[in-house]
Design a protein with these regions (language model features):
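Extended repeat-based scaffolds of very large eukaryotic assembly and lipid-transport proteins
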Residues: 1-70, 77-88, 95-124, 174-180, ...
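Internal alpha-helical scaffold/solenoid segments in large eukaryotic proteins
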Residues: 56-77, 87-88, 131-151, 155-157
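Extended alpha-helical scaffolding segments
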Residues: 126-204
């Protein structure tokens, strides 16, 4: 693609979704394009396909949210090539459009991949959050294991996702002080926290 085409895509992306820092901090506002109709939608699809051709995973996620059949195959290629939080939210977006439990495997892979330079990051927290949108046994097991993760933010969001999946009330882990006390610190009894979560949801310990 020409430099002019690349520049046009980047300018449109900035105008539509904000800069990269805003997208990282606030998330990709796919509603900016999913709400469009008629010619405006067609124009957005054209620009997003252009972004996808440039390898922009944000374009892939927006196209997935718009449920664009013409880009479906290319979006899947983008998913397989993506990493970290971008892989997480592209998989979640696809699942939200058409439930596909196997997509949880992408989130599990991110959750279980530790970057020595940033052990809690590289999408691991996002994966713990994103798994609340699934309901399979393998992804439940991955979240339960993450309750004992070495890093607090992963533990916290794994608990929050299990609470959401199991429909436990109150809906915040901080509102369950006997569990929160065990995951708040690295020296807490994380196995006990896991058992108490299961008990709160009346889930058998062998499940």
């Amino acid at each position: 693609m020409s430099e002019a085409g690349r520049a046009a895509w980047l300018a449109w992306k900035l105008k539509t979704f904000g800069d990269e820092k805003s997208i990282w901090h606030d998330g990709l506002g796919v509603e900016q394009v999913t709400r469009l109709r008629g010619a405006a939608r067609a124009d957005a699809l054209t620009m997003l396909r252009q972004g996808l051709a440039l390898g922009d995973v944000h374009a892939a996620r927006a196209l997935a949210a718009m449920d664009d059949p013409d880009a479906a195959a290319a979006v899947r290629v983008a998913l397989d090539r993506s990493e970290g939080n971008e892989r997480v939210w592209l998989a979640v977006t696809l699942h939200q459009q058409r439930p596909e439990p196997a997509l949880a495997g992408h989130l599990i892979a991110v959750l279980q991949t530790i970057n020595p330079m940033q052990p809690w990051g590289f999408g691991r927290v996002d994966a713990a959050i994103g798994l609340r949108h699934f309901a399979g046994r393998d992804d439940e097991a991955a979240l339960l294991a993450a309750v004992a993760d070495a890093h607090y933010l992963v533990r916290y969001h794994a608990c929050e996702s299990l609470i959401s999946r199991w429909k436990i009330t109150p809906t915040s882990i901080a509102a369950h002080p006997d569990i929160f006390a065990e995951i708040r610190d690295d020296v807490g009894d994380h196995a006990l926290a896991r058992e108490r979560l299961r008990a709160r949801a009346r889930r058998p310990l062998s499940a």
